[in-house]
């Protein structure tokens, strides 16, 4: 194992954010749970989550909230580090991944969208011929 002392923090990391929204193709577990058309999201702020759900319904862009189920957070415990980045179980991977990310969010409203990076069907206004 190698340790690194990071001496050049980007200025954006020093900002005091009012809101954090991250979007990532983080887990296959979300795709298994939600299928190929509905991204899941997690939030530490219920009011913010409801606003996102409302916007999703108004725009026709589907989203579905999954829980930050704290009972799974013990799966991230490690004897050799503060925590690890993957749970002990082959189940609940989207939740444990979001719980991992949440460890880096302080007292800031936060949304994590775990989305699938490609589509299986050509639809109106979608790219044709390839998958990204």
Task: Explain the meaning of each model-derived region.
Residues 1-132:
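A generic structural signal for tightly packed, nonpolar segments enriched in small/aliphatic residues
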